[in-house]
Amino acid sequence: DAYEYLMRHFATESGKSKGQFYTPAEVSRTIAQLIGIGPHNSNRQTTAYDPTCGSGSLLLKLAAEAVNKITLYGQEVSATTAGLARMNMILHDFPDASVQSGNTLADPKFKDGERLKTFDYVVANPPFSDKSWSSGLTPDADPFQRFGWGVPPAKQGDYAYLLHILRSLKASGKGACILPHGVLFRGNAEGAIRKQLVDSGTLVGIVGLPANLFYGTGIPACILLLDKDNANARRGIFMIDASKGFLKDGNKNRLREQDIHRIVDTFRKAQDVPGFARMVGFDEIRSAKNDYNLNLPRYIDSSAAEDVQDIEGHLQGGIPQRDVDALHAYWDKMPALRTALFASAGRPGYLQLRLPQADIKPAILGHGQFQAFQHAVAALHAQWAKSTRPSLVDFGQNGSPKQFIHTVSESLLAAYAKAPLLDAYSIYQHLMDYWAQTMQDDAYLLAAEGWQVHTTVETNKKGKATGWACDLIPKPLVVARYFAAEQQALEAAATALDTASSALEALEEEHGGEDMAFAGFDKVNAAQVKDRLREIGKDKDAAEERDVLKAWLKHAEDVADLKKQLKTLDAELDAKAFAQYPQLSVDEIQTLVVDDKWLAALSAAVHGEVERVSQALTKRVKELAERYAAPLPQLAA
């Protein structure tokens, strides 16, 4: 939304000094989905609280996930930023949200008598390692008994906010807090608090985030997920290392749609994913080896496999078989392709290419099993498109774009969930990128006006028409479907013009040197050429020059004629296309939008993913072949 855009832009431009009040929208959405709120478990009596609410973006993302109206509470130390949060609440139709200004730890504003008020959901992105957290507070004599597990270090207030959150949760409440990675492994007072936190069973999950996501700091952070409900029966903590999934966006990193979906799906399923996520039992966490250290690399190895150089391969030649075996994902699907590419190198454990390096890519693309893979993906996509098309054309006036893209994207993700060699989340990302760039605008237009089209005449500053456009169905789609012959004629004329123009330029270049036909011309044009022809007349000594100048005039005339022809054809095609729009039926509009625009764009994106499979395999095979092509003794000789 507009407010979110302005907040992101302001945080980006302001940097460290002013960016701390804003939690990136992608992180807020991730938390809102991880925490488990939804229309099935929320109503007006559901309460959500952010003790360090900044501009309120995290609370509002939680409310958006709930769908139903819930009751929001927030406290912010900066009076100015609290004012921003109140305005944000009003703009997002939460005028009754209670946003208070003040120091949450020293002067919490939400209380039930002498105790802290408790809430169903608490979310927070507190200042990292707050050095003045205890200002105005005597932790050992805290009236709200927040520090029974221990007092955090004087210069690191991360656990102070976490303990406040725990005290602010109802007996079955759920919470999420963004904190620096240090809270997972720092010792002394924080280690003692962490032990109590683990043993309490309220820490249900940890999500490690990429570095440089947040404004004001580049250090990596994590999301601690809390759940008091059934805490005593909990037997472990679900950990996710999502540090590798992000998009570089200017000088910051940003979670993509696929990153958010992967994190949330994995957490909800509590599904072990090598290198990404696993359920870690309390026994492992409490072991002498780990001693309550929750640092994610202790439990999840997300590092890329090392590309080991093989000494024997360098000395005697041959590609190590283990490097070829490492490409098993390809060979599992295309075993005969491996045989077509590699043969024994004459000794155990080493292989050699069967073909020249230049033939690797053609061999892969032309192999029957790779082509079968291509056909299988095409068939899978065609089946998805066929089954999804009815829901695409059924969307229309008064429809919900948000629900629309959710349904479509989830069906796409499910369709590609078991597709070999393709990452379903990457396919999903293509759809979400297209949604953000184009399809979202189409959906909102359809929701407002239904399946109808309007052309807009474009004018210059003087009010003169300069062209026209249609947002829902761009001109090229209408031309491609109804005027292919005219478009082909236009392209042929353009090609002819390019050829004639090139011939004219070549003639000028060939005869532009010293003492040649065009040597004395400042700029070659028809007037100068004709003047020169009159000047030399029928001079026999200038016969060659005369022929060149006459040839130039003929080429120039051809170029001028072709330009006129091209302009005429373009104007005729433009007029035909413009006249076609009012004649389009609803079925035709749906065909142009759904088939020729939406599904065609997604089909091209899927084809690109298949291309990347061949490129990745080609690159690795070629890399191995080049690495071990010449044994070191041969190089030394």
Q: Where do the model's predicted regions map?
A:
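Conserved adenine-nucleotide phosphate-binding loops and their immediately adjacent elements
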Residues: 12-16
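A conserved structural/catalytic subdomain of Rossmann-like adenosyl-cofactor enzymes
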Residues: 113-471, 490-505, 509-636
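Conserved S-adenosyl-L-methionine
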Residues: 17-124, 129-150, 159-160, 179-182, ...
